[in-house]
């Protein structure tokens, strides 16, 4: 690459496409894939690459893609199939027979004799979708599951790629002779194909497919763990890109009206004028905003206490982070997005630089915690409610940051901003503010301005040049030092996890979780199920692993100097002041690959806790291991083997496989009830780890653990993604909930831990978190309008938001009828939305109608006859328009 002329280089630009429909081309996390591609192609053309045509808009780009063959077989015309690139069956069969015997066998068992029957032309050759553009090939990554028997996921998570999958990459390498590929955005499926986790061999499908073809991979810089897999299993040169822009959610529609009325009530209560008369109005507004679904009011309840809860909840919603668009590769933030982006980078402390909101609370001689927990109360000195004070703080901080921005981030701009009325305060406070503003001008802004290096380094990689490495993680979680983006990012040393900081976070989360369970159930949980992923632990210094250990009453020992974990020690019951709680971990395949030592560490901790000579009331781990050991011994199992099997608590994917399987069966619509979801969850995740065991399939042990769970939990440590950002959250955590309901015959308590604010961690139920995200983001005009600015990809993400909500409801029953109704009214049936989606992505609009109709058909909600008919008509009308467009292509 370094020696070749750019004009001679052949580059394949590969868009991820999951599910394999025209509605999801370029399905990359947080990225406007099409606009990024347009800008990349313009830069490449300037640098001498041979490109004949660059679409002017994302609509024109997707029109170009879908006017040629794609993965969406249902939309492919005869003409598109005829004009499509092809690999001859003869060439593919010859290549196939050079593969390792085991790799051949697994593919033929799944897909039949080469070349199979997936994406085959009338003459028996294999289709390679895409369109040629000079020396660029614009294409979609093959699906792994074309025509797969839907029941396959219930029986075997080891799904070999199709013949067409390998043919696609073979054609790129050996027929078209590509010089490099760009996999555009996080993430594709190549690096998740079966095979070894590191040191791939002739039986590992990622290596079979890609070989030594250079792989340039723009990748979401916050998604650390998955990025490591792209490096290890697909040789990716990562180009870390910024998260999607975010802002405070604020209030809107009925919630905004209710908030104003609550403030009015508080003032009238303070003066004694007419507050009592407002009670019916307030209750009506609560119902209008559907907040009575979250916070029901019963006659006889303390009304002021109830309103205080409502006010605090609204303040929490307003303070939530909401995505207000998508990132464009190499595009620095500008205008209001830059102002809001800087405020988000300052909302938590950055090393010695305090949170801007903590600093402003100090200006008013209070604390942020006081303000947020007492929203309905009137501060006598300020003559306003704390909720109004928080609104004032948001306005003042934005005004001051905007002044620095408008002044060009200079020293003079800082001086001018400090003279504003909004920046008035005592000298000591102003000194702190000045230091914070210089942090903005000297650190934040220069780092954000280097966002253009994302594009520069993509081109450097294509030129065979060095791409500077850098750390990864969440910039908005006190991570300004992680910037600039555009670097080939790395992970962490697993031997340092959990760090002392991570341990403190895990302890806080554990205490909050137990406190909430006792409040909900009146007792300690005996059995907890935890979902543990790699990336969140890398970003949080091992908080989930720490919480796992802390539940057991075990803590790490660290080496002096290096702070690597050297051993474990038992926390005495006198110090723990509670029972040792039994905890089962469901680790991801990524955790298994990137943090294998920690699976062993957690298993060692379980055995250590179980070995303590303590009463059943003080040690639930020992209690349950003893009970299960006796059952096994009664069945004839050797005593040592029985104890070992009874103490397994770490379960995950088989080596070479990834995922929880639940999203696969939900996407294929191949399920009837929770029993089906439980079956696939156990089949994919029922492999034990620990004591030298690296994924031995013991489904009955996993079923036993799942059936006994009182509580499930998955923690989040940043708000750059949430439970509706990806179907993985539901597949792992929702799948666990469904499995407990099926196998245990009960609905467990299910929590989401939140350590986004390291100084004030929190815990919510899954249903509470769903409603928080639904209200603060999914229904928020800022979110919807932000995505609408991104055309095709924005519509894709809106449709996926509805689909993931449906999937959560399927596993966990967290969607109420009114929530489906709001999705229908705001997303699918709104005339303005329909007009826009038909223009930019009609396939996504059809998917929305289909999802809502499936929910009604499965009796997950009652759409009502009128709304159901509207949705059916919408589905059919879009289908007809798409068919007409296809006929035109003929």
Feature roles, as predicted:
Residues 1-890:
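Ligand/cofactor-recognition surfaces for anionic moieties
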């Amino acid at each position: 690459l370094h020696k070749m002329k750019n004009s001679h280089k052949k580059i394949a630009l590969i868009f991820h496409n999951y599910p394999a429909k025209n509605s999801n081309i370029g399905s990359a996390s947080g990225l406007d894939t099409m606009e990024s591609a347009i800008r990349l192609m313009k830069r490449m053309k300037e640098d001498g690459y041979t490109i004949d045509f660059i679409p002017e808009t994302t609509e024109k780009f997707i029109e170009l893609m879908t006017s040629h063959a794609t993965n969406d077989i249902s939309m492919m015309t005869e003409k598109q199939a005829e004009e499509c690139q092809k690999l001859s069956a003869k060439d593919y069969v010859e290549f196939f027979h050079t593969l390792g015997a085991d790799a051949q066998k697994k593919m033929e068992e799944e897909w039949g004799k080469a070349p199979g029957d997936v994406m085959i032309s009338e003459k028996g050759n294999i289709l390679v979708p895409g369109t040629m553009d000079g020396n660029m090939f614009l294409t979609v990554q093959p699906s792994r599951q074309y025509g797969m028997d839907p029941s396959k996921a219930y029986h075997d998570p080891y799904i070999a790629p199709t013949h067409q999958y390998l043919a696609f990459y073979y054609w790129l390498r050996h027929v078209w002779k590509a010089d490099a590929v760009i996999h555009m955005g996080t993430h594709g499926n190549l690096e998740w194909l079966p095979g070894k986790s590191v040191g791939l061999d002739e039986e590992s499908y990622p290596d079979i497919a890609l070989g030594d073809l250079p792989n340039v991979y723009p990748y979401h810089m916050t998604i650390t763990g998955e990025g490591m897999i792209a490096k290890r299993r697909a040789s990716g040169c990562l180009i870390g890109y910024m998260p999607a822009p975010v802002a405070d959610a604020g209030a809107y529609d009925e919630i905004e009206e209710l908030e104003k009325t609550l403030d009015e009530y508080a003032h009238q209560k303070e003066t004694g004028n007419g507050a009592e008369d407002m009670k019916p109005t307030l209750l009506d507004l609560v119902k209008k905003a559907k907040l009575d679904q979250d916070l029901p009011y019963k006659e006889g309840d303390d009304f002021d206490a109830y309103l205080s809860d409502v006010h605090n909840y609204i303040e929490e919603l307003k303070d939530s982070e909401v995505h207000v668009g998508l990132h464009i590769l190499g595009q620095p933030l500008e205008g209001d997005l830059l102002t809001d982006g800087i405020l988000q980078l300052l909302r938590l402390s950055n090393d010695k630089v305090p949170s801007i909101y903590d600093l402003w609370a100090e200006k008013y001689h209070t604390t942020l915690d006081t303000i947020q927990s007492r929203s309905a109360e009137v501060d006598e000195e300020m003559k306003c409610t704390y909720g109004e004070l928080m609104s004032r703080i948001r306005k003042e901080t934005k005004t001051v940051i905007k002044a620095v921005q408008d002044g060009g981030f200079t020293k003079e701009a800082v001086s001018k901003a400090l003279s504003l009325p909004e920046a008035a305060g005592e000298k000591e406070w102003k000194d702190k503010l000045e230091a914070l503003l210089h942090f903005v001008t000297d650190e934040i802004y220069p780092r954000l301005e280097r966002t253009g290096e994302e594009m520069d380094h993509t081109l450097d990689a294509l030129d065979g040049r060095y791409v500077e490495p850098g750390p990864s993680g969440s910039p908005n979680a006190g991570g300004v030092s992680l910037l600039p983006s555009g670097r080939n990012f790395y992970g962490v040393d697993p031997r340092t996890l959990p760090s002392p900081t991570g341990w403190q976070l895990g302890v806080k989360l554990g205490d909050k979780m137990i406190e909430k369970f006792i409040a909900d159930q009146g007792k300690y949980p005996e059995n907890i199920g935890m979902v543990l992923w790699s990336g969140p632990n890398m970003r949080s210094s091992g908080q989930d692993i720490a919480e796992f250990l802390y539940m057991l009453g075990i803590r790490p020992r660290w080496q002096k100097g290096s702070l690597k974990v050297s051993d474990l020690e038992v926390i005495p019951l006198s110090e723990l002041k509670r029972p040792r709680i039994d905890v089962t971990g469901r680790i991801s395949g990524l955790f298994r690959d990137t943090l294998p030592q920690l699976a062993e560490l957690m298993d060692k901790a379980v055995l250590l806790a179980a070995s303590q000579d303590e009463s059943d009331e003080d040690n639930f781990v020992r209690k349950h291991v003893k009970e299960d050991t006796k059952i096994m011994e009664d069945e004839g199992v050797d005593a040592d083997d029985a104890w070992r099997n009874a103490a397994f608590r770490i379960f995950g994917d088989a080596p070479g496989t990834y995922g929880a399987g639940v999203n696969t069966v939900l996407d294929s619509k191949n399920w009837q009830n929770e029993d089906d979801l439980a079956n696939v969850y156990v089949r994919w995740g029922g492999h034990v780890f620990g004591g030298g065991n690296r994924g031995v399939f013991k489904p009955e042990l996993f079923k036993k653990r799942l059936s006994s769970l009182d509580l499930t939990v998955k923690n989040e440590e940043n708000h750059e993604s949430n439970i509706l950002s990806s179907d993985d959250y539901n597949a792992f955590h929702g799948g666990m909930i469904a499995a407990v309901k099926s196998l245990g015959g009960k609905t467990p308590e299910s929590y989401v831990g939140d350590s986004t604010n390291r100084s004030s961690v929190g815990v919510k139920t899954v249903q509470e978190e769903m409603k928080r995200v639904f209200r603060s983001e999914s229904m928020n005009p800022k979110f919807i309008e932000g995505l609408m600015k991104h055309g095709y990809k924005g519509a894709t993400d809106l449709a996926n938001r509805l689909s993931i909500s449906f999937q959560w409801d399927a596993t966990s029953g967290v969607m109420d009828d009114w929530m489906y109704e709001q999705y229908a009214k705001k997303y699918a049936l709104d005339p303005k939305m329909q007009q826009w989606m038909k223009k930019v992505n009609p396939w996504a609009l059809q998917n929305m109608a289909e999802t809502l109709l499936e929910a009604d058909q499965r009796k997950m909600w009652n759409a009502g006859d009128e709304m159901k008919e509207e949705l059916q008509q919408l589905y059919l009308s879009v289908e007809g328009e798409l068919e007409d467009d296809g006929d035109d292509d003929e």
